[in-house]
Amino acid sequence: MCIRDRYDMVQANIAIVDQARNGTGCAIVHSDDAIGIQHLNQEASKALSAGIRAGFKISKARAMKWITSNPAKAAGIYDQTGSLVIGKNADVVVWSKNPFSVYALAEKVFIDGGLAFDKKSNYFPSSDFDVGIISPNKNRIEE
């Protein structure tokens, strides 16, 4: 992103899209970044705050749709995922606080119906999420 792009950006853009078509817009908070995608709740919170500052009346429940049901609708898979409904696929995060708070921590994460993370557990599986593909013949620490 160049400096000019930063000056030209509209911080309330997500809220503006949300309010399009008489409040039926399909706003989406997304990230192309491996780290940013882990903080979509915080990005949605920033977008919600920018929208409120711009004068839009948007509830936290509506803003939550920006990272849940709206992306599923946009991808054409809302009949399969995007909301907690019997018969749909869903991963669930149990938060310690309001998920729009920077102080919120994931307490538990359920993926495909199974407990994948529990903050109270001593077991923390390692992940190559932000490391990338590792050569199977090398040790990542020595690379």
Segments the model singles out, each with a brief description of its role:
Residues Q19-N22, I111-E143:
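Extracellular/periplasmic ectodomains of large secreted or surface enzymes and adhesion receptors
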Residues P99:
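Small/polar (Gly/Ser/Thr/Ala-rich) solvent-exposed segments
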Residues L105-A106, K120:
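Short, solvent-exposed loop/turn and secondary-structure capping segments
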